[in-house]
Amino acid sequence: GTVVAPMVGLEVKVLVKDGEKVQEGQPVLVLEAMKMEHVVKAPANGYVSGLEIKVGQSVQDGIKLFALKD
């Protein structure tokens, strides 16, 4: 499935690489909004796909962050 940004924010940490295998609940990246950090976690087991976001990049609410493939 596709994981989208839950809010407008700034990408501050990318914790995995594109193509990396992740487990459900594993932190994938961290967004910052209004001085608060929000950890975006993998919603299921799978391989991260399409992770193109870079540290320092602004994201809009609902923008695709990455997808998970079996």
UniProtKB/Swiss-Prot annotation:
Domain Biotinyl-binding: 1-69
Lipid biosynthesis among keywords: yes
Pathway field: Lipid metabolism; fatty acid biosynthesis
Keyword Lipid metabolism: yes
Gene Ontology BP terms: fatty acid biosynthetic process
GO cellular component: chloroplast
Keywords recorded for this protein, A-Z: Biotin, Chloroplast, Fatty acid biosynthesis, Fatty acid metabolism, Lipid biosynthesis, Lipid metabolism, Plastid
SUPFAM superfamilies, sorted: Single hybrid motif
Localization annotation: Plastid, Chloroplast
Annotated InterPro entries: Biotin_BS, Biotin_carboxylase_complex, Biotin_lipoyl, Single_hybrid_motif
Function (record text): This protein is a component of the acetyl coenzyme A carboxylase complex; first, biotin carboxylase catalyzes the carboxylation of the carrier protein and then the transcarboxylase transfers the carboxyl group to form malonyl-CoA.
Protein's name in the database: Biotin carboxyl carrier protein of acetyl-CoA carboxylase
Modified residues (N6-biotinyllysine): K35
